[in-house]
Amino acid sequence: MSIFIQLNNISVNFNNRSILSNISLALTPNCILTLIGPNGAGKSTLVRVILGLLKPNQGKIFFKNNLRIGYIPQKLNLHSTLPITVNRFMNLSYFNDKNYIQGMLSRINIIHLKHHPLQKLSGGEMQKVLLARALLKKPELLVLDEPTQGIDIIGKIAFYKLVNQIKNELKCSILMVSHDLSIVMANTDKVICLNNHICCSGPPETISKNSEFIAIFGNIGKNYLALYRHRHNHHHDF
């Protein structure tokens, strides 16, 4: 099996404090890997390591040559005194094919927003803009760090449905970081529960029975994982 990114015994320390301890995982083609864990578990730190933004104190990392990665951050901080439209934001990328950019805005159903200032967008609209920009390089791996934070339940469902459609179209892999157990798990192939170390990993139905997972998330998390596993034998209308 080909591998996009392989982490072997990765550890990260800040100020003599262990943030990540002996993390080993592999990101493979055409799969959805969901990373969950409590606040302070090291999820965002692990994402920075995977993106190559942070060098670990220990361990080895393997990246596929010329791996194309798209990234959607938790939040994009914009200064109110520097207004910028969606169209200008999209064109700030290295990608200079204007027709392709407009086509991507249409694909994500936000072409009507292209002249809107980013500061005026709703949370759901902003995440769609970030998704469109992340897709410009036709990523093999799409990394989403708490992508629906602050979005209402209907917006979350619509966003995850769109992401799953994109995944199927591009045949890309997705690394999802989230607390939204009730929704994110719907199409997840593998779950990793992180709390400084990897507590447990596997398909949702296996994780839901793990004692360390239950200790962190309780029976609410257990019920979410059991209830929302997608069996691919029905469809949803939104």
Swiss-Prot record:
Query: For this protein, what is the EC number?
Result: 7.2.2.20
Q: Say which enzyme class the record assigns.
A: translocase
Boundaries of each ABC transporter domain copy? 5-220
Topological relation to the membrane, as annotated: Peripheral membrane protein
Keywords linked to the UniProt accession: ATP-binding, Cell membrane, Ion transport, Membrane, Nucleotide-binding, Translocase, Transport, Zinc, Zinc transport
Record SMART domains: AAA
InterPro entries assigned to the protein according to its UniProt record, in alphabetical order: AAA+_ATPase, ABC_transporter-like_ATP-bd, ABC_transporter-like_CS, Metal_Ion_Import_ABC, P-loop_NTPase
A GO MF term? ATP hydrolysis activity
Q: Which GO terms describe its cellular component?
A: plasma membrane
User: Keyword Methyltransferase on this protein?
Assistant: no
A Pfam match? ABC_tran
The record's section on PANTHER family has: METAL TRANSPORT SYSTEM ATP-BINDING PROTEIN TM_0124-RELATED, ZINC IMPORT ATP-BINDING PROTEIN ZNUC
What do we know about how this protein assembles, alone or with others?
Answer: The complex is composed of two ATP-binding proteins (ZnuC), two transmembrane proteins (ZnuB) and a solute-binding protein (ZnuA).
| Family stated for the protein in its record | Belongs to the ABC transporter superfamily. Zinc importer (TC 3.A.1.15.5) family.
Query: What is the protein name stated in its UniProt record?
Result: Zinc import ATP-binding protein ZnuC
